[in-house]
Amino acid sequence: MRCVPVFIILLLLSPSAPSVDAHPKTKDDVPLASFHDDAKRTLQRLWIKALCCYGYRFCCPIFGKGK
């Protein structure tokens, strides 16, 4: 009888069938993967600019012609 409550709790914690999104997608909805890709690209550009400007000011977009 001790196993019954544990079994019921495990059943409640187990993943259920995938839910269906109740809201229809609109043109304003952006997939999360796309958002993460954009954020990753932006961070990579900023990182490259930071490395470039740190040692070589001539390649920095603020001080020179580089991007």
From Swiss-Prot:
Keywords noted in UniProt: Amidation, Cleavage on pair of basic residues, Disulfide bond, Secreted, Signal, Toxin
Tissue: Expressed by the venom duct.
GO molecular function terms attached to this record: toxin activity
Subcellular location per the Swiss-Prot or TrEMBL entry: Secreted
Modification comment: Contains 2 disulfide bonds that can be either 'C1-C3, C2-C4' or 'C1-C4, C2-C3', since these disulfide connectivities have been observed for conotoxins with cysteine framework V (for examples, see AC P0DQQ7 and AC P81755).
Predominant location category: secreted
GO cellular component terms attached to this protein's record: extracellular region
InterPro entries named among the record's database cross-references: T-conotoxin (IPR031565)
Keyword Mitochondrion among record annotations: no
Pro-piece positions: 23-48, 65-67
TM stretches of this protein: none
Domain notes from UniProt: The cysteine framework is V (CC-CC).
Family the UniProt entry places it in: Belongs to the conotoxin T superfamily.
Identification of the protein by name: Conotoxin LiC33
